[in-house]
């Protein structure tokens, strides 16, 4: 219901949305408790059997960063970090912030590589997938008239303005540890500068 409501004002084909929503399943469990992973493992197995799905699973950790070590550890303890078939695979996606310092990032990286192969680990920042960032790439590289001129010889300066209509909302705990400067400037805005 929440997904459908959030897409209410978007241009979404109802047939495609219904087809997608039939494949969305929700399972609430305490990710700090190993028993929850048994429930998740059983649910995945059940869905794979019922819908004849391949043994290809992505774990997307859209969680507070403090959980980035515990969740993969629990997945491993429950045998969920390795595929159960020859043609299967497992992937884990971790959103930034990837540690709070070089040392903590290296520690987290070492921990993840102990549980998953490097090729199975994806470290991402959702910001580059946003429409504005994608439009910069399209505007620059898809327009043959601009691409050869888009360099220091023809551009005096680049100004990037970050305007958000969201407040802290429920992200207070995140900003207490990560900080708005680290989240917005050091990550998102520097990424936009790199695109230009």
What are these regions (language model features)?
Residues 1-196:
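Secretory/organelle targeting and membrane-embedding segments
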């Amino acid at each position: 219901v929440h997904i459908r409501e959030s897409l209410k004002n978007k241009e979404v084909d109802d047939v495609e949305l219904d087809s997608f929503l039939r494949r969305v399943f929700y399972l609430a469990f305490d990710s700090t408790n190993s028993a929850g992973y048994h429930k998740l493992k059983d649910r995945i197995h059940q869905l794979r059997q019922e819908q004849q799905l391949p043994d290809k699973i992505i774990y997307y950790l859209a969680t507070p960063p403090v959980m980035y070590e515990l969740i993969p550890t629990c997945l491993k303890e429950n045998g969920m970090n390795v595929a159960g078939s020859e043609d299967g695979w497992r992937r884990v996606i971790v959103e930034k912030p990837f540690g709070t310092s070089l040392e903590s990032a290296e520690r987290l990286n070492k921990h993840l590589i102990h549980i998953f192969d490097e090729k199975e680990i994806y470290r991402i920042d959702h910001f580059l997938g946003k429409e504005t960032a994608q439009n910069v790439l399209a505007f620059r590289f898809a327009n043959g008239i601009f691409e050869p001129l888009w360099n220091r010889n023809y551009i005096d300066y680049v100004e990037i303005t970050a305007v958000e209509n969201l407040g802290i909302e429920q992200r207070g705990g995140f900003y207490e540890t990560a900080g708005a400067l680290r989240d917005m400037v050091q990550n998102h805005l520097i990424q936009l500068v790199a695109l230009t």
